[in-house]
Amino acid sequence: MAEVNGDFPVPSFADGTGSVSAGLDLLVERSIHEARSTEPDASTQLTIIFGGSCRVFNGVPAQKVQEIIRIAFAGKQTKNVTGINPALNRALSFSTVADLPIARRRSLQRFLEKRRDRSTKPDGSMILPSQLTIIFGGSFSVFDGIPAEKVQEILHIAAAAKATETINLTSINPALKRAISFSNASTVACVSTADVPIARRRSLQRFFEKRRHRFVHTKPYSATTSEADKNETSPIVT
């Protein structure tokens, strides 16, 4: 029975109160807790990026991640980019040109900038080291110059320590991106003309017919000719 409070009726429940029963509250709270417990914990997810590929391991303990980071730190070979090419050091060690005339100083500055740009271009003697990125628990670590053998060892350790199936992502390879974009372009080019308006579709069909007609007749040593062309080229007998 509903009780009237002023002008608005207040519903009464089985327990005699004007609110939802405690049993229903516990049921809703338990359902929400179960739904949250089924979601993957992002804090135990380990992501390793190396050589254009990305691999995700779920359920890796923090102690195992610390071991992986120690292995990566011991195997890194960080180099100073400035010290790789001696020509770059010579270009940076030039004395100041503030005491030269303005026109000559600007010309010399442009010359030094061009020389520095040429020196910093990558060549056979300036190879950038491989980079390993480890993401875990909302933080990431980047290591330069990690050998591929050391990365394979790290991947084996992470795979052995994972609690669930590994996710292999190959979405950051430039060659794969180009292949996907080319595939998408080909798919768009092969879309049917059924969704084109009627007038435009007919015009497009005539265009393709004329194009095929020109291709057949301009192709050298073509043995296929249409009946209409034979009738047009045959002499008229009166």
Curated annotation (Swiss-Prot):
Its main location: nucleus. A motif (Jas 1) lies at residues 101-120. Residues 39-74, 125-160 form the Tify domain. One of its GO terms (biological process) is defense response. GO terms for cellular component: nucleus. The keyword Nucleus applies. Repressor of jasmonate (JA) responses. Targets MYC2, MYC3 and MYC4 that are JA-dependent transcription activators. The jas domains (101-120) and (197-222) are required for interaction with COI1. This is Protein TIFY 3A. It comes from Arabidopsis thaliana. The gene is TIFY3A.
